[in-house]
Swiss-Prot record:
Keywords of the record: Hydrolase, Multifunctional enzyme, Purine biosynthesis, Transferase
Pathway where this protein functions: Purine metabolism; IMP biosynthesis via de novo pathway; 5-formamido-1-(5-phospho-D-ribosyl)imidazole-4-carboxamide from 5-amino-1-(5-phospho-D-ribosyl)imidazole-4-carboxamide (10-formyl THF route): step 1/1; Purine metabolism; IMP biosynthesis via de novo pathway; IMP from 5-formamido-1-(5-phospho-D-ribosyl)imidazole-4-carboxamide: step 1/1
Stored Gene3D superfamilies: 3.40.140.20, Methylglyoxal synthase-like domain
InterPro entries the UniProt entry points to: AICAR_Tfase_dup_dom_sf (IPR024051), Cytidine_deaminase-like (IPR016193), MGS-like_dom (IPR011607), MGS-like_dom_sf (IPR036914), PurH-like (IPR002695)
GO-annotated cellular components: cytosol
Domain MGS-like: 1-144
Disulfide bonds: none
Domain-related comment: The IMP cyclohydrolase activity resides in the N-terminal region.
Family named by the database record: Belongs to the PurH family.
The protein's name in its UniProt record: Bifunctional purine biosynthesis protein PurH
GO terms of biological process kind: 'de novo' IMP biosynthetic process
Catalytic activity reported: (6R)-10-formyltetrahydrofolate + 5-amino-1-(5-phospho-beta-D-ribosyl)imidazole-4-carboxamide = 5-formamido-1-(5-phospho-D-ribosyl)imidazole-4-carboxamide + (6S)-5,6,7,8-tetrahydrofolate; IMP + H2O = 5-formamido-1-(5-phospho-D-ribosyl)imidazole-4-carboxamide
Length: 510
């Protein structure tokens, strides 16, 4: 009995050549719809599914291959006598290779098609054939990836197709149908408004193999979530080396801070080191913003990454090139500025799509077999309540907002001391709030903190932070409030003629 291959593909790249090679290997080809038409027109010896099933396609093509003459031919075990007797009794011909790729559900979704069009692009027969062939991988070769055509033909020609090869193809097949179903499930979750379903189907596809992970002894990879809404890591690389694991992590931190200021009339420049801000500056243009960012911490910025929410001009590029940086990311680059930055061969230059609010409603943290999920931290403050005798000036209120936008993106416990749209001192990742403040102040003793604003990601449990801030000349504090000892901090502010404003929103970040 001759071997048979069933071919039914949406992506017809390379399928004619593949089918012709199968013909040369004495495979009979069965096909459906447009695939049959393509193969026939290109000289492939092919028969229609109806020739096998003796039943026409019905329901506008919804039912083509859902038939015992198809699935029986795929699923029967060649080494089981009762199976062989059954297919012989019913005159079911074996199908030994199944090459299927599915209706482009994902592409239809991304194209913003109507609900009815999306539904019609849910493949039923394709996944069924793939799963049948993958289940019976010992007897049937399943092909879901056009990149596998050449290697499969070569193995068939040389009779070197091993059981391990078949198992790998089966694994790829089930991964493909699993991803496909997850995309459909995710679409329907959105349709019914179920943001946090009892069963969460997420699917990711490997985008990049990285040189290594966080450290050289760790492997590292980048996976992209299928159908992610407005991913923040959306950039075009214009120069420099390939991004590393740590580069990508730091870049994400940089873009999160840039997103905080996406609606600002001023330009923001942020410097990031180990995913934390080491300097942030606001300015009328890229040069002023970066200058303030750089002068905020001239030491820590070395070897960091810099993001700027505007187009980088020649003057800014020249200043950026004065120090070693891993990445420069901006909305765009003037031609002359780009050439200047490219003088540093290893500098990664990234052009960023304009940042929008994330449409992904939640953020995730993987905990070794479990997944923590929470709403995105999209709220800066729920109020601006002055709780002291002294009232904030307009300039102080502006710096308070600036400081809170910075500190909410730093690792807790976090403190940001700012003045005139520039960070003067930052303290983060400390196990006590007073240590975060001491760390910020003592590492920047050369700075003039007179009239500065202190922003805290969480409330003060004691009045020690206010007292220390006063000793350095800080005149205003913005914090969430909510401590049982708020009264102590308020009284300390009144004692020192300082301003304190409560926002009502805590910004822990771990």
């Amino acid at each position: 009995m001759s071997k048979r291959a069933l071919i039914s593909v949406t992506d017809k790249t390379g399928v004619v050549e593949f089918a012709k090679e199968l013909n040369k290997l004495d495979y009979e080809i069965i096909s459906t719809g447009n695939t049959f038409k393509t193969l026939k027109e290109n000289g492939v010896n092919v028969m229609q599914v109806e020739d096998v099933t003796n039943f026409p396609e019905i329901l506008d093509g919804r039912v083509k291959t859902l038939n015992p003459y198809i699935h029986g031919g795929i699923l029967y075990k060649r080494d089981k006598e009762s199976h062989v007797e059954t297919v012989n009794e019913h005159k079911i011909h074996s199908i030994d290779l199944v090459a299927v790729n599915l209706y482009d559900f994902e592409g239809t979704l991304k194209a913003g098609k109507s609900h009815d069009e999306i539904i019609e692009n849910i493949d039923i027969g394709g996944p069924s054939m793939i799963r049948s062939a993958a289940k019976n991988y010992k007897d049937v070769i399943v092909v879901v990836d056009i990149k596998d055509y050449d290697s499969i033909i070569e193995k068939l020609k040389t009779d070197t197709m091993t059981l391990e090869d078949r198992k790998k193809l089966s694994y790829k097949a089930f991964s493909t149908t699993g991803r496909y179903d997850a995309l459909i499930s995710s679409y329907f979750a959105g349709e019914v408004g179920d943001t946090y379903p009892d069963i969460l189907n997420l699917t990711f596809q490997k985008e990049q193999t990285l040189r290594y992970g966080e450290n050289p002894h760790q492997n590292g990879f980048l996976y992209s979530q299928s159908n992610a809404k407005n991913p923040i890591l959306n950039y075009e690389q214009l120069g420099g080396k390939e991004l590393s694991f740590n580069n990508l992590n730091d870049l994400h931190g940089c873009l999160e801070v840039m997103r905080e200021f996406k609606d600002s009339e001023e330009v923001v420049s942020v410097a990031i080191k180990h995913a934390n801000s080491c300097g942030v500056g606001l300015g009328k243009d890229a040069f002023e913003a970066y200058t303030k960012c750089y002068e905020a911490d001239k030491v820590s910025i070395f070897g960091g990454i810099v993001g700027i929410t505007s187009t980088i001009d020649k003057a800014t590029a020249e200043k950026l090139n004065e120090i070693f940086l891993e990445i420069v990311v901006a909305y765009d680059f003037e031609p002359e500025a780009l050439e200047i930055l490219k003088q540093k061969k290893n500098l990664r230059i990234l052009k960023l799509a304009k940042i929008e609010n994330s449409l992904q409603p939640y953020e995730m943290k993987y905990l070794d077999g479990k997944l923590l999920i929470q709403d995105r931290n999209n709220i800066l403050a729920e109020k601006s309540e002055n709780v002291t005798k002294e009232k904030p000036t307009d300039a102080q209120l502006k710096d308070m907002e600036f400081g809170m936008r910075v500190v909410k993106n730093m690792k807790s416990n976090a403190i940001a001391i700012v003045k005139n749209g520039q960070t003067l001192a930052l303290g983060c990742g400390q196990t006590s709030r007073i240590w975060a403040l001491k760390n910020a102040l003592e590492n920047n003793k050369d700075k003039d903190f007179t009239g500065a604003v202190l922003a805290s990601d969480a409330f003060f449990p004691f009045d020690d932070c206010v007292t220390l801030a006063h000793e350095y000349g800080i005149s205003a504090v913005v914090q969430p409030g909510g401590s049982i000892k708020d009264k102590d901090s308020i009284e300390a502010c009144d004692k020192y003629d300082m301003v304190m404003v409560f926002t009502g929103i805590r910004h822990f970040k771990h």
